[in-house]
């Protein structure tokens, strides 16, 4: 009895039901799922490989990822998702996505569960592209452009790493890591040498830079009440860049959701003089009414927010008019399948989409595929330090910014593979599920 006959003998549901409860099983079958937490490179990352075989014995491997609480996400994949996925049709992407999304949302599973779905979805889209010999953006209806405009966000090689790896690091992504002086440490340089950093980015072809200049104020003062001196401190790098370089580079501010409504207004009104392209997450998106009040009371564009992870959360923001643009992380909202839904919804409101990446190479590639197939995407975030120092240790493809753009991936699938040496079965962060074990 071959592998396909064994699966057919074990499961009689050859096709999906209208509820998607039974996975469609007539195409290339999922034979194994591997996950890895690369603690020594990016400890917050979960890398995934999905193995597939068709009836003629041909094999493929799909690649995906997500970021944050990776061990918990791996448990969701292996302990909950794998019984549905193993032996099922790898190309039944919508069936898998709809069933797993509805099961997770039914019990408020918008953390590790939605990240797990995102990682699986990326891998399945990668497989679809490989099997059909097309890049994902082509399967999504693209191209709508040949390359995607990018900006640099103020992370560094030490961003998001533990304080065991980098002494003094907070170990909490998005929590105001000050960085340290050194090559590519843009979180440090954006505060201490902002003009020099801006010049360097312009020379490298970047069109924009996002600063985290109020994070230090928050670490010292908290976010409930700031003085005029505090506001001036956070504004200083922006003023220095504008005074030295004028409008040669777009400037944005990420507030990481640290501030109260009153303080957020103070910051926004002070920022008007430096003409930012947008303000991002100056306050948390917890209350839609507060977000609307904030946007209506200022004259600076507002971006909201990779802190949102469900389609319904973005819908409420768009319906209420709480944002001038939305930011999406593809590996937090349900993968390619979730991201394209949200980006297309935003188009109905004439609100542009921004793609997030501080989180991993497959996240960045997924954003490029969405941008390559959706005219509403305006900008792709990058962290040049990650492109230069971390991503080369993870994937087999170089991602190079040229003239402020990244080219659309032309390779079939997502456009890269995990480095083969990452998935060592003896690695402490490795897990595998297949038909024999989980």
Protein language model features and the residues they cover:
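Short N-terminal binding/cap micro-motifs at the start of the first secondary-structure element
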Residues: 40-45
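Short beta-strand elements
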Residues: 46-54, 398-401
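Metal-dependent enolase-superfamily TIM-barrel catalytic cores that perform enediolate-based chemistry
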Residues: 147, 152-293, 297
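Shared catalytic-loop signature of beta/alpha-barrel
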Residues: 79, 83, 95, 269, ...
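Proline-centered loop/turn at the N-terminus of a beta-strand
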Residues: 135, 149, 250, 301, ...
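Conserved, mostly hydrophobic/aromatic
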Residues: 30, 59, 81, 120, ...
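Flexible C-terminal active-site loop/helix
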Residues: 2-20, 25-38, 342, 358-438
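Metal- or metallocofactor-binding catalytic centers and their adjacent structured scaffolds
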Residues: 18, 56-132, 138
């Amino acid at each position: 009895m071959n592998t396909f006959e064994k699966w057919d003998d074990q499961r009689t549901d050859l096709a999906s039901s209208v509820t998607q409860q039974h996975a469609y099983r007539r195409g290339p079958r999922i034979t194994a799922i591997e996950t890895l937490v690369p603690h020594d490179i990016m400890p917050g990352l979960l890398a995934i490989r999905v193995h597939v075989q068709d009836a003629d014995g041909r094999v493929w491997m799909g690649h995906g990822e997500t970021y944050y609480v990776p061990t918990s996400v791996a448990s969701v994949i292996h302990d909950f998702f794998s019984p549905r996925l193993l032996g099922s049709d790898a190309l039944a992407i919508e069936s898998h996505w709809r069933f797993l999304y509805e099961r997770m949302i039914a019990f408020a599973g918008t953390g590790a569960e939605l990240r797990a779905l995102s990682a699986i979805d990326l891998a399945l889209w990668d497989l679809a592209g490989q099997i059909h010999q097309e890049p994902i953006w082509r399967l999504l209806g693209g191209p709508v452009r040949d390359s995607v405009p990018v900006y640099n966000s103020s992370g560094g090689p030490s961003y998001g790493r533990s304080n065991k790896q980098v002494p003094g690091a907070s170990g909490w992504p998005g929590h105001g890591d000050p960085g340290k002086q050194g090559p590519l440490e843009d979180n440090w340089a954006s505060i201490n040498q902002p003009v020099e950093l801006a010049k360097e980015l312009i020379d490298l072809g970047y069109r924009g830079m996002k600063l985290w200049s109020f994070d230090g104020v928050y670490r010292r003062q908290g976010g409930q009440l700031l003085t005029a001196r505090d506001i001036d401190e956070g504004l200083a790098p922006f003023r220095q860049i504008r005074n030295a370089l004028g409008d040669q580079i777009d400037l944005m501010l990420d507030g990481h959701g640290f501030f109260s409504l009153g303080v957020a207004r103070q910051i926004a009104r002070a920022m008007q003089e430096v003409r930012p392209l947008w303000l991002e997450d100056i306050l948390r998106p917890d209350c839609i009414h507060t977000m609307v009040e904030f946007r209506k009371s200022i004259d600076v564009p507002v971006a909201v927010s990779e802190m949102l992870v469900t389609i319904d959360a973005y819908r409420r923001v768009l319906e209420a008019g709480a944002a001038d643009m939305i930011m999406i992380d593809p590996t937090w909202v349900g993968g390619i399948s979730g991201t394209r839904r949200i980006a297309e919804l935003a188009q109905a409101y004439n609100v542009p989409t921004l793609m997030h990446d501080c989180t991993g190479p497959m996240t960045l590639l997924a954003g490029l595929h969405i941008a390559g197939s959706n005219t509403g995407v305006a900008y792709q975030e990058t962290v040049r330090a990650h492109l230069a120092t971390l991503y080369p240790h993870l994937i087999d493809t170089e991602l190079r910014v040229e003239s402020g753009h990244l080219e659309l991936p032309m390779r079939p699938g997502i456009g890269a593979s995990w480095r083969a040496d990452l998935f060592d079965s003896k690695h402490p962060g490795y897990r595998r599920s297949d038909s024999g074990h989980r």
